[in-house]
């Protein structure tokens, strides 16, 4: 299949730049698989399409503040996007790096508590970077890292490239209400519309809920650079399925639910 077969027009004014005031009041499109009929509802009405005995599987990954902006020794700006922790070292991450003349041996200063050392180039703009800090890296990221919003969500930036007055709404709303295990660099967006009251109503209707963890990776937003879709290389993502959840899912499938 050719990538051009998937092209369509999406007017910019139809791309919401702020979340709906109430999570579960986002729009919901329902397609009837038998007749193809389309209904336009609100998300909290999803409960009308679930019945007692159904199993709802949720992704409890938590988005990390993976965007860092710093300066090289020359004074040039460098933007870092953390992708995945290296298996061999706690302080080494594979990162997407934006900026000129990034090469092994370059140091990037983010603030007084954090600097990065470029170790090696992996390819496609990705580098392995060792982070130097006298504190816990996750704590520092929570303080100075920024939410990795999708590129179609625009926020004003200062001269250094950081988002101005990062919204607490962005910090909170770009997580699901059941976000728990840190590791995603993008939100599992289908889950963003659930609320605690809606989940309680779902449980009260006799619907079971099972949690799995899929750390959403950069492949969810990186561009497809090939003409033939079959030539596109999907990036791997880490996941974990607890034994209790696996049992619930297998039982539901066996029973045809």
Question: What is each stretch, according to the model?
Answer:
Residues 1-257:
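Surface-exposed, charge/polar-rich loops and edge strands
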């Amino acid at each position: 299949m050719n990538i051009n077969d998937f092209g369509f027009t999406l007017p910019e004014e139809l791309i919401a730049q702020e979340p709906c005031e109430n999570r579960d009041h986002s729009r919901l499109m329902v397609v009837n698989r038998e007749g193809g009929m389309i209904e336009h509802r609100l998300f909290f009405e999803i409960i009308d399409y679930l019945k007692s005995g159904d199993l709802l599987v949720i992704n409890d990954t938590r988005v990390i503040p993976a965007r860092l902006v710093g300066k090289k020794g020359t004074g040039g700006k460098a933007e870092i996007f953390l992708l995945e922790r290296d298996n061999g070292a706690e302080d080494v991450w594979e990162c997407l790096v934006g900026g000129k003349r990034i090469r092994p041996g370059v140091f990037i200063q983010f603030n007084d508590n954090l600097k990065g050392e470029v170790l090696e180039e992996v390819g496609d703009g990705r580098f392995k970077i060792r982070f130097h800090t006298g504190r816990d890296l996750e704590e520092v990221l929570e303080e100075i890292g920024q939410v990795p919003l999708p590129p179609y969500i625009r926020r004003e930036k200062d001269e250094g490239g950081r988002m101005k007055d990062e919204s607490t709404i962005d910090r909170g709303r770009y997580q699901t209400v059941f976000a728990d295990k840190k590791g995603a660099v993008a939100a599992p967006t289908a889950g963003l519309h659930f609320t605690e009251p809606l989940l309680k109503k779902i449980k009260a209707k006799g619907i079971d809920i099972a949690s799995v963890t899929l750390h959403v990776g950069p492949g969810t937003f990186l561009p497809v650079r090939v003409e033939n879709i079959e030539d596109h290389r999907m990036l791997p993502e880490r996941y974990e399925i607890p034994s209790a959840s696996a049992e619930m899912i297998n039982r539901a499938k066996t029973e045809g639910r």
